[in-house]
């Protein structure tokens, strides 16, 4: 198993010292994740690219997933590496790999070469292409728009025959940009905006203003943990939860209805600024898009920005909702967002779209700011890696089962994509697939005389979902951990 990792082109327009630092950080990020997820896989920095090698293909899929989900990588070449004697030896190796691929098709040969050789790249392309054309009668050469492009690289004394080219995430390596604090609600927008800053190289910490109780917090923890685990697990980041119920109660009691939405957002930013200052974080990230709701007009956004010195970043400011949902689907947060309640939208019945500074200040003068300060003071700060541990601690009453009886039903709560990749098949045991985001609404329709065991890959989601079902009064739920 061998992969050649090509950093994003923007890395190479930096000065030599910055470029070297960025690639070292990318190397470190990859090594920390790959060593955790695999055994015997090496990560080697080759200055202008990174090589990832393993003695066997045992960890091929896991390694490829890490490489295509790590920020800072433009593309990944999956290669077969060997030595060579001369151009004819290279041709014979290319023929062995590509004979069936080019049969009955048009093709061309493209070569990248580094090092000192007695041939040029063009000479090598012509030699190999001519040889393939003569050896495979049904194939024909077409230099423009061929059906197949035979690609390989010659690096000094090594030949890299390209098996496949995999698109990377792009962006900058995680940790090359300053940290940001994402105001995450679990919906489409905040998840996508968090992802975009991870992709751009920032360590994203998560700040959650809890307006919906334990169930809402568990849901937001799930999506935050998912984003970190899939795209940013080389970084140590925080998940911070602030109970905003007292703040909302104060607003509902003392603030005019039309100003409530903007004032609530101003309270979010004030609290976010306090938390960011405490942890030395320069920027707040939100999922706001221009005109999407009443508080997101230019006038209102300006009034919201004015309450904090922290830089407010809005990567989705000009995005259409449809495009946001499409990206959420692509990165895997759509299923979380579909079932995440939106509590902010119900706070104001007749929201203003063009708030006036004097009116806002008049209404906020009625507000007891010690309530906000106390809420921030009582904020719960945790390492996002502890969410998995906490799910075990929060649900001690959820029984873990490793052996199955014939009278139980196993509920596979993974996403359809995960279930398709690794179907769960158990001899003599009924297995039903209900994605986690449908479990809350579908579970009540099941035969409640039966016992149900929830299953997911790592056991995090299954424990959290079991806790929610038990809190809702269901006692016939356990977690299956084979």
Swiss-Prot record:
EC nos: 2.8.1.4
Active-site residue numbers: 456
Protein residues bound to ATP: 183-184, 265, 287, 296
UniProt KW Cell membrane keyword: no
MF terms in GO: ATP binding; CCA tRNA nucleotidyltransferase activity; tRNA binding; tRNA-uracil-4 sulfurtransferase activity
Keyword tRNA-binding part of the UniProt annotation: yes
Family annotation (Pfam families): ThiI, THUMP
Disulfide bonds: 344-456
Ranges where the THUMP domain occurs: 61-165
BP term (GO), one: tRNA 4-thiouridine biosynthesis
CDD domains per record: PPase_ThiI, RHOD, THUMP_ThiI
SUPFAM superfamilies: Adenine nucleotide alpha hydrolases-like (SSF52402), Rhodanese/Cell cycle control phosphatase (SSF52821), THUMP domain-like (SSF143437)
Gene3D superfamilies: 3.30.2130.30, HUPs, Rhodanese-like domain
Keywords, alphabetical: ATP-binding, Cytoplasm, Disulfide bond, Nucleotide-binding, Redox-active center, RNA-binding, Thiamine biosynthesis, Transferase, tRNA-binding
Domain Rhodanese: 404-482
Cellular component aspect of the GO annotation: cytosol
Pathway of action: Cofactor biosynthesis; thiamine diphosphate biosynthesis
Functional summary from the UniProt entry: Catalyzes the ATP-dependent transfer of a sulfur to tRNA to produce 4-thiouridine in position 8 of tRNAs, which functions as a near-UV photosensor. Also catalyzes the transfer of sulfur to the sulfur carrier protein ThiS, forming ThiS-thiocarboxylate. This is a step in the synthesis of thiazole, in the thiamine biosynthesis pathway. The sulfur is donated as persulfide by IscS.
Similarity annotation: Belongs to the ThiI family.
Protein's name in the database: tRNA sulfurtransferase
Lineage: Bacteria, Pseudomonadati, Pseudomonadota, Gammaproteobacteria, Vibrionales
């Amino acid at each position: 198993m061998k992969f050649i990792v090509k950093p994003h082109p923007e890395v190479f327009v930096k000065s030599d010292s910055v470029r070297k630092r960025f690639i070292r950080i990318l190397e470190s990020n990859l090594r920390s994740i790959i060593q955790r997820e695999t055994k015997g896989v090496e990560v080697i920095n080759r200055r202008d690219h990174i090589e990832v090698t393993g003695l066997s293909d045992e960890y091929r899929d896991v390694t490829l997933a890490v490489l295509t989900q790590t920020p800072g990588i433009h593309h990944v070449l999956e290669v077969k590496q060997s030595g060579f004697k001369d151009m004819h030896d290279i041709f014979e190796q290319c023929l062995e790999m590509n004979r069936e691929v080019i049969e009955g098709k048009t093709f061309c040969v493209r070569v990248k070469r580094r090092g000192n050789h007695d041939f040029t790249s063009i000479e090598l392309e012509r030699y190999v292409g001519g040889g393939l054309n003569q050896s495979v009668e049904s194939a024909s050469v077409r230099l423009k728009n061929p059906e197949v492009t035979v690609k390989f690289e010659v690096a000094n004394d090594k030949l890299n025959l390209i098996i496949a080219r995999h698109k990377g995430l792009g962006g900058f390596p995680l940790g090359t940009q300053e940290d940001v604090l994402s105001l995450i609600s679990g919906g489409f927008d905040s998840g996508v905006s968090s992802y975009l800053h991870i992709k751009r190289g920032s360590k994203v910490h998560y700040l959650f203003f809890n307006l919906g109780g334990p169930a809402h917090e568990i849901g937001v923890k799930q999506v935050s943990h998912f984003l970190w685990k899939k795209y940013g697990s080389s970084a140590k980041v925080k998940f911070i939860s602030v109970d905003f119920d007292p703040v909302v109660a104060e607003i509902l009691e003392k603030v005019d209805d039309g100003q409530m939405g903007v004032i609530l957002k101003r309270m979010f930013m004030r609290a976010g600024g306090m938390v960011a200052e405490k942890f030395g974080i320069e920027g707040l990230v939100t999922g706001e898009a221009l005109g999407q709701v009443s508080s997101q007009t230019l006038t209102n956004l300006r009034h919201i920005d004015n309450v904090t010195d922290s830089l407010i970043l809005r990567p989705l400011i000009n995005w259409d909702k449809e495009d946001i949902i499409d990206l959420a689907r692509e990165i895997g947060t759509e299923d979380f967002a579909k079932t995440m309640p939106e509590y902010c939208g119900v706070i104001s019945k007749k929201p203003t779209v063009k708030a006036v500074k004097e009116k806002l200040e008049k209404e906020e003068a009625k507000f007891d700011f010690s309530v906000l300060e106390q809420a921030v003071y009582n904020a719960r700060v945790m390492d996002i890696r502890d969410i998995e541990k906490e799910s075990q601690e929060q649900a001690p009453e959820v029984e873990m089962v490793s052996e199955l009886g014939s009278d139980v039903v196993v509920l596979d709560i993974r996403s359809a994509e995960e279930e398709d990749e690794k179907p769960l098949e158990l001899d003599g045991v009924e297995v039903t697939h209900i994605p986690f985001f449908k479990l809350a609404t579908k579970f009540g329709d099941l035969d409640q005389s039966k016992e149900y065991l929830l299953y997911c890959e790592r056991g995090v989601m299954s424990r959290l979902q079991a806790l929610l079902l038990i809190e809702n009064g269901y006692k016939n739920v356990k977690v299956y951990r084979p």
